[in-house]
Amino acid sequence: MRKLYSSMFAIVVCAFLATSCQKDYKSDGAAQPSKSNAAAKTNATTPADVAATLTKLRATLPPNFESRLNNIKADLLAKVNPEYKYTVLNVLKLAATPCDDNTMVTQWLNMQLSDWTYDIIFYASLTGMLDFPTYDALLFTNSESGQQFGINGEYTQRITKTIKDLKRFWDIQSSQIIVVPMHGSMLQDRDRVIRMDMVLFGDTEPAAEFWADLIAELLQDIPQYRNGNHPIFTFNSFAQASFSFPPYGVVPDKIVMGDGIMDSYTAIGYGDVAPQAILAHEFGHHVQFQNNVFGTESSPEATRRTELMADAMSAYFLSSARGASMQWKRVKEFLQVFFNIGDCSFNSINHHGTPTQRMAAADFGYQTANNAQKQGHILSSVEFIALFDAALPTIVSK
């Protein structure tokens, strides 16, 4: 995971400095580092006032800025499931993937990025804006009290109801699991940005203050960043088991829901089902955590198993009479879009399964609910896992 982030950033820096470092990063499967394809993903031109601001800011960068992202704490990178990272890399043209970039979601994201020039992408990556909302939610948003989901709180009611239903549905200890939002607006909070910079990059406080002030100036002067609320900053959701994080304390069991990932599916017409389905998938990972499903193996096959199982668990809950009780036709329409966001890096340890395999796993979950002899009966998590593992060879053969 560290290699992915470091390579991504190095490509942008190489292009920014107009140097030739193609040989170093081509083997990572990343885009070749040139302004035409590493970051300048559109034909957008930078307005004169914005260009002047960026030129002024470039002169203030510290001498060692090229190596900045190499300092990210590897142990923190491992905490976040990069479920949607390849989609972000793909639309920003920061790394080449074999994924289909002509899906409804990537088309929408590309529209949101149509006015992002190479320099705008560069500063979003260099400063940490692409990462700070994610890790701030992971490490420091540790209470559900007063939280709202969505930029304007538009998903709060659905998320709150769905997590209550999930906790009643699955037979795990879940009272300690919290659901928290990921907001790009945290980039406006200087103190939070300073803290996040010191934690993620290991910077001294004066250095962190420099980057926080740079971000503040960028948010003020570059309208493309939407004051931190651009969906690219929060296009993610993930589950995390509790862990100790000294000197700050213990991070609780949690699910993080990004504004950007929910906004994207709402924009293309699936706002009625997307928040619930995404949350149900992430809750499935907590069911797995408590049943020791993950084990110690790190391989594409092991990750594919757990992700396909979470897909099946989500569909089982969504279609069950005692779960979300949604119409399967509507859920299936959403999942066919959701599973095509672009996870096709088959040799990556983060591989989630092909779209066809993921749909087969979801169909297994639906059929398990629909074919139950006693409608409304909920399988125990142990029973469901056993049934899924028995069906897995058939699912992956799709």
Please tell me what each predicted stretch does:
Residues 261-277, 297-301:
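Short pre-active-site segment immediately N-terminal to the catalytic Zn-binding motif
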Residues 160-167, 254, 280, 284, ...:
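Extracytoplasmic/secreted envelope proteins and their assembly/folding machinery
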Residues 282-298, 317-322:
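Catalytic Zn2+-binding segment of zinc metalloproteases
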Residues 25-28, 319-398:
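Long, well-structured alpha-helical subdomains associated
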Residues 32, 40-230:
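A metal-dependent hydrolase signature that marks the N-terminal structural subdomain at the beginning
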Residues 247-251:
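Extracellular/periplasmic catalytic domains that process cell-envelope and extracellular macromolecules
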Residues 300-327:
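Post-HExxH zinc-binding segment in Zn-dependent metallohydrolases
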Residues 1-5, 15-48:
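Bacterial Sec-dependent N-terminal signal peptides
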